[in-house]
Amino acid sequence: MFKIALDLMPSDSHKIIIRADKTPAGKHTRRFNSPTIDEVAVIIVGENLQSRDIVLHRRNSDLKRVSETHRSYDALQYPLIFWQGEDGYHFNIKMVNEVTAPLLAVFVLAPESPPRISEEMTRSNDLVFCNLHTRSPVLKPTKKVSAMNFYSYRLMIRQGEVNHILMCQRLFHQFAVDMYVKIETERLTYIRLNQRQLRSEEYIHLRDAINADGNVNNVGRMTILPATYIGSPCHMHEYAQGAMSYVRHYGRPDLFVTFTCNPKWSEIKRELLHSQTPVDRHDITARVFKQRLKSLMNFLLKHCVYGRVRCWMYSVEWQKRGLPHAHILVWLVHKIRPDQIDSIISAEIPDETVDPKLHAVVTKHMIHGPCGLFNYNSPCMVDGKCSKRYPRDLLAETITGNDGHPLYRRRSVADNGRSVVVKVRGQNVDVANRWIMPYSPILSKVFETHINVEYCNSVKSIKYICKYVNKGSDMAVFAVTNANDEISQYQMGRYVSSNEAFWRIFSFAIHERHPTVVHLAVHLENGQRVYFNESNAADRAARPPSTTLTSFCQTDDFARTLLYADVPRNYTWNASSKSFQRRKQGTPVEGHPNVFSSDALGRIYTVHPNNDECYYLRLLLVNVRAPISFKQLRTVNGQLCATYREACQLLHLLENDSHWMIRSRIP
């Protein structure tokens, strides 16, 4: 056995206090909610994960530091799970080709029929595998297994095998969040180590440095977390801007759907082991919710229950509530009219005699609270009031206001409305329609869970909704207190629950959308961003990299009829050749043979007005078709302008105060 070094050191008992009332300025308050359930979670402090200080007390009383990626870490940290001391994840696990894996065997397993091995293979130190059917040699795989692949493999359910990890209840949850932190540490370590070598700078500055003295040590800056890193600020900002691209092209979304996991789904109960409850198996709830979410999207997109869908997007969240839920935005080809709302969305208790199944689902999943006088300890209560504005007013008809929040029909009992008796804190409470959350009868009946469906009425609410859907990972403001409850300082960290850890270990998507949004670069001439290191700086300076903007200026005749943001509809961006290529599939464009159109959208990166020349360049790209060069963009009616701002003024793209000056001179 072993001892953790911390056990040998006298220390006060500490506890972590999470404060939901302390939200950093500029951050979405929902990211900092207090946990509403008892769950296992980890709080990651800081933007970048650092190596943990893991110290063991050896038998000879020496202290030894162990990395979380050491092959023995899992067995040392979780001896109850890995009592045989089996190896955990480490960097040198080789990946076997998934196609040929069933046919591979080490040579010594079949000595009576040796494979044909060349002299070169014999001289090498590589272990040789052979195909059992052809007896032809196959060299040892060189690709390594990632931490995410390894732990996803360990959590799998296999027929005929007993995976004892799945039986460890809360220790299982702790193992999951611990291993997810290890996965994130590996990814961030890779980015951090590569960024020490990789630098970025505008091309013109790199070229000047190379031409001057060839020293690039003082040129450029370290790169930051890329937008491809899920959950990074850049990633969430791009998704929010992508949602606004849908709004610019197709107007407001029609429906805002919140789909929540139901732990009592039959698929979850069926997969539980003996004496287990859904609380013990967050891995199953993650898998089932993923499949149910897929079914819901198919229900909306393929079966077109509300009409043909033009575009959609969703984000999966937890918000410290335990079970996952998805926020979905749906744009329809034919917009929902106000007189159609009542046929799609209801905020009333259904008639039990007409539809007993729907009545059971609504009364079980779609009643808010009740809170207020019935339960002041409800999570929705803030300063003595319900933050969700319940109970709502009773209305005979649905009203679509101008603030973006429609008021749904909620009839009173005297006006053919209904009520139901529910238990709240041991007391019977008569609940009427004013406590019902808006729902779609067909979705509630099919999926038997909490599905809140809202009609998006006004453009005023769209910006908030788009930011809400893409607000980012859960966060927590917390403090560590000692035995005397003394708080030294508050800290902010990322909050990862065991439910989220399983979801991410299984590589399930956090965000999905359709159609794709292609990001289009905008920069001044020779101002494109260049990524380089010391070994390739000269080559990068000699050959400036192509961007979507420079490639747009070099495309064919049909592209010269398009605006910059419209190019992705008819062209795909080839990342390897750095060029636009015509689409080979899609809807044929009339009058243009071999030209096809798709539903892809283009989004030109935003530019701050303080960067004035680049800002005016972007304004020209939004309005001017088919520029063949930066020089032509500054040419208006044959006149070459000195600046892009001057070109914008000649094209009347800017407001001018000169007419006010002229009027002020008139007596």
Where are these regions (language model features)?
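Extended, structured polyanion-binding interfaces
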Residues: 1-667
